[in-house]
């Protein structure tokens, strides 16, 4: 199974609901409880979820597993500094989620709360007390190019170089066209198109594909990059870097077709942390391994988009994983 990182807030914070006492557990990483700033992140979570159980670990997250088996929570939030979070950490959390009882399915909805610093992590927790309804999107996916789920939408196509589309507020459908923006070598300037769409539509949702690493996000056909520096995203244009235009609104970032971009890589200078910090991503799902075709990502997106309003983002990805696990069990 391809590993996907459910970053930021655990499922209940995205639901806009308050689970019953003991339905929510918080697992604090090494030194979190003793750090005045990071302990405030935990306190903010407990304020959002009264009665939440508080657990901790010192060496490995699975130290909390015996207590989780006893509590049997429905939601678990792991609070850690970026320097603690990497590929192996996420793999361990995926395995833990299936280890509370004896079957092969996930036993709780979970996510990671982190940030460029403690203040950024706390800001996300506090902002998530109000549910986020997605009405607008910017994308680099042909798969969502019809834009039918959104009131406003724009995309850069990842199969036909230079093809773009826009659905302006009030329009019934997407208008497709070939961009006239070009680079000095004649290739379409897809990075400029994407950044202009981002600024103009101020999207609630961003979905992306094409190459990526922990340090960059390529536009389709390798025409330009978004990069991270000092916890902020910028466009790496030939004429010089430009910060990605931000308004401070919360967003959802789903790099469904990108390798590695979900891997925090044990540093706060990663792309994942920059999306949380400067782009105010309130929810993010991303791969921590080299893949662009995993069912964990594409399937979760399909569960969420094809039943609009039925599931929260966290619920959609959770249900997709259970579907995958059932299929794997069935195939033996």
Could you tell me what each predicted segment is?
Residues 2-8:
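Sec-dependent signal peptide recognition
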Residues 20-332:
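Cysteine-dependent hydrolase recognition
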């Amino acid at each position: 199974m391809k590993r996907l990182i459910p970053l930021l807030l655990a499922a209940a914070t995205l639901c806009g609901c308050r689970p019953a006492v003991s339905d929510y557990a918080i697992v604090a990483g090494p030194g979190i409880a003793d750090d005045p700033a990071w302990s405030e992140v935990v306190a903010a979570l407990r304020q959002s979820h009264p009665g939440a159980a508080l657990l901790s670990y010192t060496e490995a997250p699975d130290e909390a597993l015996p207590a989780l088996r006893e509590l049997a929570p429905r939601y678990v939030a792991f609070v850690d500094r970026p320097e603690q979070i990497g590929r192996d950490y996420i793999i361990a959390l995926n395995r833990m989620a299936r280890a509370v009882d004896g079957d092969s399915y996930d036993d709780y909805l979970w996510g990671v709360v982190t940030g460029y610093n403690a203040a950024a992590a706390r800001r996300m927790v506090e902002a998530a007390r109000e549910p986020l309804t997605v009405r607008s999107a910017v994308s680099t996916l042909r798969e969502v190019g019809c834009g039918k789920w959104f009131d406003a939408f724009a995309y850069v196509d990842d199969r036909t170089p230079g093809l773009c589309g826009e659905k302006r507020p009030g329009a019934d459908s997407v208008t497709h066209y070939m961009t006239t923006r070009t680079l000095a070598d004649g290739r379409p300037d897809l990075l400029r198109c994407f950044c202009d769409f981002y600024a103009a539509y101020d999207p609630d949702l961003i979905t992306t594909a094409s190459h990526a690493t922990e340090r960059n996000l390529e536009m389709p056909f390798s025409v330009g990059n978004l990069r991270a520096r000092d916890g902020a995203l910028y466009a790496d244009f030939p004429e010089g870097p430009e910060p990605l235009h931000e308004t401070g609104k919360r967003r959802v970032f789903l790099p469904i077709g990108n390798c590695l971009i979900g891997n925090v890589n044990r540093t706060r200078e990663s792309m994942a942390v920059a999306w949380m910090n400067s782009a105010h991503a309130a929810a993010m799902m991303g791969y921590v391994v080299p893949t662009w075709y995993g069912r964990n990502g594409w399937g979760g997106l399909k569960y969420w988009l094809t039943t609009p309003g039925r599931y929260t983002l966290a619920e959609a990805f959770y249900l997709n994983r259970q579907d995958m696990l059932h299929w794997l069990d069935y195939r033996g």
